[in-house]
């Protein structure tokens, strides 16, 4: 017979909540997710507000702040109830599960038991429409959580699909389509026709969703449609909406950079900043626009543009102190564009090499430094060495793929003096 403690432990493990889901809990990712969640507008019309607070509570717990965790879990409860205009419902199952786990870790087993009982009562009163499936509210929250953690987008889309099949919901429909879009992110021709048509239908059903509208514009542009006028019309709407990462500004700026011009993208980002000069999210978006413009080789940057790019990156690094590695790498690359900035670029790289980085972040650093050595220092041998260091790290990412691609190109040409070493290296390189 199991003891009371064993029974409690088994009941906790059986819960559907953030504490039991298989999430990537690297500290650097937790910090990035926390900052990304802070950049989402928390106005009362945000249907994800309860989910956002739930996730922020879990992240704060994993980062060591139990008090903040409880505060956010309680805010999630309130947000769910206000949004649904009800004191209880299946949307609270994950939230109560989180609170059961938190009180268990705090040593308050009676309170943990109380929340377990609440979960049991909700599951009994609001069973899933399908005995073989989780409740659609749970699938939707699980999908949203994985999406925030940059998880498997195909799995995210599957969870949303399961939720929608049991409980049609316009917001879930929109996010299902976005998940399908993210899953096809690296396709040069855009979405498959069936997903594209689904996106068109959902966008017509959810016309106020500017984030979805901007992504739809991206896909239409990739299909060869002329979208300049619509992009400018959408920009007016985005500028008038609450500031946040769901406003549609990020994908819209991508459309501007790709299909209109880098300079107009900068103008749009600067206009947004003029309206809200203290918003760190807008500074982050503007910094990226300047970085892309500075790196455009066919049109040299003016000193004033370089100065603005540097100052924005410096601000963003200060505003995101725990999740600014990529911005530091971008700043180093911007410095490297001018002769006077070479020493500053090298200083940033060397400081990063001395800092503690998780393997995945170290991989990104090696890849960036390899490109810096090749393009700015013309040190091709050392550049290849750093590409090999990036490829060695057993983490599948864009940066690993890029480094391997560079090495394969050298191997296939067969003319570089390191060709034999690279051929042996690639032949013995294990897959993650």
Language-model features, listed with the residues they occupy:
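Start-of-helix signal in alpha-solenoid helical-repeat scaffolds, especially tetratricopeptide repeats
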Residues: 43, 48-51, 90-94, 136, ...
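Flexible helix-coil transition and linker loops at the boundaries of alpha-helical arrays
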Residues: 37-45, 79-90, 122-135, 169, ...
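Helix-turn-helix repeat elements of alpha-solenoid scaffolds
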Residues: 20-37, 62-81, 107-124, 149-157, ...
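N-terminal alpha-helical interaction modules that lie
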Residues: 1-83, 98-113, 117-118, 123, ...
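Short amphipathic alpha-helices and their capping/turn residues within compact interaction modules
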Residues: 64, 81-85, 105-108, 117, ...
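"A position-specific structural signal for the A-helix of alpha-solenoid helical repeats
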Residues: 13, 48-55, 62, 91, ...
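Eukaryotic alpha-helical solenoid repeat scaffolds
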Residues: 2-13, 30-33, 192-196, 203-204, ...
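Solenoidal tandem-repeat scaffolds enriched in leucines and small polar residues
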Residues: 122, 126-245
């Amino acid at each position: 017979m199991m003891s009371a403690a064993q029974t409690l432990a088994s009941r906790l493990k059986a819960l559907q909540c953030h504490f039991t889901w298989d999430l990537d809990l690297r500290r650097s990712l937790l910090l990035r997710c926390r900052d990304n969640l802070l950049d989402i507008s928390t106005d009362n019309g945000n249907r994800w507000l309860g989910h956002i607070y739930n996730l922020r509570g879990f992240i704060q717990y994993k980062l060591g702040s139990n008090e903040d965790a409880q505060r956010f879990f309680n805010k999630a409860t309130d947000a769910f109830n206000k949004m649904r205009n009800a004191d209880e419902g299946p949307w609270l199952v994950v939230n109560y599960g989180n609170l059961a786990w938190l009180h268990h870790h705090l040593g308050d087993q009676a309170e943990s038991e109380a929340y377990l009982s609440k979960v049991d009562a909700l599951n009994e009163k609001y069973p899933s429409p399908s005995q073989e499936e989780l409740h659609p509210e749970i699938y939707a929250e699980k999908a949203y959580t994985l999406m925030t953690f940059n998880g498997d987008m195909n799995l995210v889309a599957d969870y949303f699909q399961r939720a929608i099949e049991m409980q049609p919901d316009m917001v879930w429909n929109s996010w299902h389509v976005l998940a399908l879009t993210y899953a096809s992110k690296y396709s040069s021709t855009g979405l498959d026709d069936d997903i594209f048509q689904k996106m068109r239908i959902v966008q017509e059903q959810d016309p106020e969703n500017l984030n979805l509208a901007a992504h739809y514009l991206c896909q239409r542009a990739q299909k060869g449609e002329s979208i300049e006028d619509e992009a400018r019309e959408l920009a007016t709407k985005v500028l008038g909406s609450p500031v946040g990462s769901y406003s549609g500004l990020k994908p819209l700026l991508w459309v501007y950079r790709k299909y209109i011009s880098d300079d107009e993208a900068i103008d749009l980002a600067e206009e947004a900043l003029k309206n809200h000069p203290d918003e760190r999210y807008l500074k982050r978006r503007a910094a990226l626009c300047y970085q892309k413009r500075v790196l455009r080789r066919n049109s040299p940057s003016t000193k004033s543009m370089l100065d603005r790019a540097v100052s924005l990156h410096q601000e963003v690094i200060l505003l995101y102190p725990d999740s600014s590695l990529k911005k530091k790498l971008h700043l180093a690359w911007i410095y490297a564009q001018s002769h006077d900035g070479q020493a500053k670029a090298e200083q940033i790289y060397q400081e990063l090499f001395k800092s503690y980085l998780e393997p995945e972040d170290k991989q990104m650093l090696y890849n960036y430094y390899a490109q810096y050595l090749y393009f700015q220092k013309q040190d091709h041998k050392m550049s290849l060495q750093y590409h090999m260091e990036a490829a060695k790290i057993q983490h599948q990412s864009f940066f690993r793929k890029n480094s391997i691609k560079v090495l394969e190109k050298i191997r296939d040409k067969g003319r570089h003096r390191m060709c034999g070493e690279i051929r042996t290296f690639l032949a013995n390189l294990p897959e993650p």
